[in-house]
Amino acid sequence: MHCPFCRHPDSRVVDSRETDEGQAIRRRRSCPECGRRFTTVETAVLAVVKRSGVTEPFSREKVIKGVRRACQGRQVDDDALNLLAQQVEDAVRATGSPEVPSHEVGLAILGPLRDLDEVAYLRFASVYRSFESAADFEREIEALRAHQDVTRSG
């Protein structure tokens, strides 16, 4: 890695530590040329493949923005949204693939959002699953009730 101070093409790792709950590695480096130290943070790249075929980096902020829209007017705070985004990223990373289709990100959002707020879940699901009629909502509400029955009894 190039030194950011003198642009020397090599550096030595002095210390490495996990950070961001194991999602990144913080490395302290030393330049053999100028002797200055600097820090780098390394993360595994996770890319989302959109329907159009375009690939873009996974963004927790984009997850939060989409879910926040569904939660508009609901009693959902920023901490809950941040936790949901972390759960979604963890689920997507758990697939082990460096690239995931955008529909898998949407699926990963649905479960935690259902547990967080049912109304927000229905709003998000209606857009994600392209509801076209009240019957689509009715089917989803029935599935939601069935899920509640299973979680209460189990």
Curated annotation (Swiss-Prot):
Keywords: ATP-binding, DNA-binding, Metal-binding, Nucleotide-binding, Repressor, Transcription, Transcription regulation, Zinc, Zinc-finger. PROSITE patterns: ATP_CONE. Its cofactor is Zn(2+). The keyword Nucleotide-binding applies. Residues 46-136 form the ATP-cone domain. A zinc finger (unnamed) spans 3-34. GO terms for molecular function: ATP binding; DNA binding; zinc ion binding. It comes from the Bacteria. InterPro entries: ATP-cone_dom, NrdR-like_N, RNR_NrdR-like. Binds 1 zinc ion. Pfam families: ATP-cone, Zn_ribbon_NrdR. One of its GO terms (biological process) is negative regulation of DNA-templated transcription. The keyword Glycoprotein does not apply. Belongs to the NrdR family. Negatively regulates transcription of bacterial ribonucleotide reductase nrd genes and operons by binding to NrdR-boxes. PANTHER family: TRANSCRIPTIONAL REPRESSOR NRDR (PTHR30455:SF2). This is Transcriptional repressor NrdR. It comes from Mycobacterium sp. (strain KMS).
